[in-house]
Amino acid sequence: MMTIREYKRAESLEEAWQLNQKRPNRVLGGMIWLKMENINVGTAIDLSGLGLDTIEETDEGFSIGAMVTLRQLELHPGLAAYTDGAVRESVRHIVGVQLRNLATVGGSIYSRFGFSDVLTMFLALNASVELYKGGVVPLAEYAQRPYDRDILCLLYTSDAAD
């Protein structure tokens, strides 16, 4: 069971980062993966107003916001074409549409679960993540790091982070 004492919709990444430095506070996405834990959250930090819910295509690849849902990944025609349908296939078997409408890319990557089809897919694509304070890091390196209090903002495919 998860208990939340306070809720705060962050107005900036800096505000979200500052709030997240206090140990009992947590960043919220779709909350699917947090529900798997028995935790007490001091302040639940909502990133939904920060524009991290978009997928942008450039000549180099894609930038994917941490608040993009798995359903958005599944339905994005550009990502489907870029990966020859692999992204769509990697998420379409994850529980049901209702869960994919809630679960976020950020939560799926940040939690680094061994069972994560999303993490596996983006590792295969040599993706990178952008952390608010930590900058751009290869996903393979990030997946090996211990958890910290930084905020995962974006995921980049191949050269899109350059």
Model-derived segments and spans:
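Conserved PLP-anchoring active-site segment centered on the Schiff-base-forming lysine
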Residues: A161
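C-terminal structural segment of proteins
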Residues: M1-S158
